[in-house]
Design a protein with these regions (language model features):
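Glycine-rich phosphate/pyrophosphate-binding beta-alpha loops
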Residues: 65, 89-94, 139, 176-180
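A short core secondary-structure module
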Residues: 81, 85-130
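A short, Trp-centered hydrophobic/proline-enriched beta-strand micro-motif
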Residues: 51-59
Length: 217
């Protein structure tokens, strides 16, 4: 609860502050901790603790996709490694991350969420590209971009969990994030109420602040 109280207070300021805290406090490291192989956790979990790595979470696509309509693919090559192609949209923290959690289709023959798998992708992998998108109102200090994968070869060791577990991993990880979003909304609403009250007291019409008018009350 303490971190949610902090989240609430951070959310009274610029959007970048609340977004970074909300992600860094949990989603940033939890996916690897919960679903990474022993090899990946041994290699990278300490780096989260000393803050030498950060991640982004790449699920959403421009089609509106966060589930069955995801189109980014990860196809196995002859060595069992993966070749990723596709695009993501509305992804935060792409300007400050070393890795991306990417949800992609690994088996087109399956239905629904069983098609999807999750990967821990180093952003310096050839074929990984950050693409621009319009700035989001209300998110000052936080970058949002697209991501594009073009014949991006990824070692099979970067698979998280098992094939077909991608949406389970995404939803499990996002569930804690929702508590942070609720605390953020509370902090933002409190600040907006304060600003509205201040404006109502400062704005004078016909010799009186509008806060004294029956409609405003």
């Amino acid at each position: 609860l303490d971190i949610l109280r902090v989240q609430e207070q951070f959310s009274r300021g610029p959007g970048g502050m609340r977004m970074h805290l909300h992600y860094a406090a949990d989603l940033n490291w939890r996916i690897l901790d919960d679903y990474g192989s022993d090899e990946l956790k041994a290699q990278y979990m300490d780096k989260f603790q000393d803050k030498t790595i950060f991640t982004c979470f790449a699920l959403t696509e421009q089609s509106g996709g966060t589930g069955a309509d995801i189109h980014t693919t990860a196809v196995k090559d002859e060595n069992g490694d993966y070749i990723l192609n596709g695009e993501k949209w509305l992804i935060s923290h792409t300007d400050c991350c070393e890795f991306a959690y990417v949800i992609a289709v690994t088996d087109e023959s399956k239905s629904g969420d069983e098609r999807l798998s999750a990967f821990f992708v180093p952003v310096d992998t050839p074929g990984y590209e950050v693409t621009p998108m319009p700035h989001m109102m209300g998110a000052r200090g936080a970058a949002h971009t697209g991501l594009k994968f073009t014949d991006m070869k990824l070692d099979k060791k970067y698979l998280l969990g098992e094939e077909g577990q991608g949406m389970e991993i995404a939803i499990h990880s996002l569930s804690v994030s929702r508590a942070h979003i609720a605390a953020s909304n509370l902090g933002m609403c409190q600040r907006m109420l304060e600003m509205s009250l201040a404006r109502a007291n400062d704005r004078i019409t016909f010799g009186k602040p509008i806060a004294s008018r029956q409609m405003i009350k």
